[in-house]
Curated annotation (Swiss-Prot):
It comes from the Eukaryota. InterPro entries: ARD (IPR004313), ARD_euk (IPR027496), RmlC-like_jellyroll (IPR014710), RmlC_Cupin_sf (IPR011051). It catalyses: 1,2-dihydroxy-5-(methylsulfanyl)pent-1-en-3-one + O2 = 4-methylsulfanyl-2-oxobutanoate + formate + 2 H(+); 1,2-dihydroxy-5-(methylsulfanyl)pent-1-en-3-one + O2 = 3-(methylsulfanyl)propanoate + CO + formate + 2 H(+). GO terms for cellular component: cytosol; nucleus. Binds either 1 Fe or Ni cation per monomer. Iron-binding promotes an acireductone dioxygenase reaction producing 2-keto-4-methylthiobutyrate, while nickel-binding promotes an acireductone dioxygenase reaction producing 3-(methylsulfanyl)propanoate. Ni(2+) binds at H99, H101, E105, H144. Its cofactor is Fe(2+); Ni(2+). This is Acireductone dioxygenase 1.
Length: 199
């Protein structure tokens, strides 16, 4: 990703280390002082980011190119807000449980905003704020969670390879092949110790 494209992407996708306070999950939870995380660091964890034209997603050639190159054949739209999502509070709590999937999770924010939290190489939470125009891909096997921010609204495009399978495996599920493959590819070393991804 070129510097200009990265700068534009950082306008709609920003990341920082969480303060780990247990109060309202919908707040930013910056550390004091703030510790921002670059898109390059997210990429080291397997998290991919793009900035796209959310107002013209139906005709966006870049979205089409990404979908074709990555095999995202299925698409649907969902709105996470009290008025549109049945059992809203229950669902928001469920999304915020730390979990992984055996396939990629792909979300494209068409309106509103929300937080995706992921773990770094030392198992410390990074908060990723995705706003309108941000497309983010989480690799299979990465532990993560989601919450809307204090605006309580996000309209997202969900993309899938094949059918819309969304099965969450709450932590711990380190025995799953997708987790082992993720650890082998991205978490080879934590601190000074090697991870045995075959265990």
């Amino acid at each position: 990703m070129g510097e200009a494209a990265k700068d534009q992407t950082e306008e709609v996708i920003q990341a920082w280390y969480l303060d780990n306070k247990e109060e309202d999950q919908k707040l930013p939870h910056h550390k004091d002082p703030k510790e921002f995380v670059s898109l390059d660091k997210l990429a080291e964890l397997g998290v991919l980011c793009w900035r796209l034209d959310a107002d013209n997603y139906e005709t966006d050639e870049e979205l089409k190119r990404i979908r074709e190159s990555r095999g995202y054949s299925y698409m649907d739209l969902c709105e996470v807000c009290p008025e549109k999502l049945p059992n809203y509070e229950e669902k928001v709590k469920m999304f915020f449980e730390e979990h992984l999937h055996i396939d990629e999770e792909i979300r494209y924010c068409l309106a509103g905003s929300g937080y995706f939290d992921v773990r770094d190489l030392n198992d410390i939470w990074i908060r990723v704020w995705v706003k309108k125009g941000g497309l983010i891909v989480f690799p299979a096997g990465i532990y993560h969670r989601f919450t809307v921010d204090s605006d309580n609204y996000m309209k997202a495009m969900r993309l899938f390879v094949g059918g819309p399978v969304w099965t969450a495996y709450n932590r711990p599920h380190d025995h799953l092949p997708a987790r082992k493959a993720y650890m082998k590819k991205f978490l080879k070393v934590i601190g000074d110790r090697n991870i045995d991804a075959s265990a």
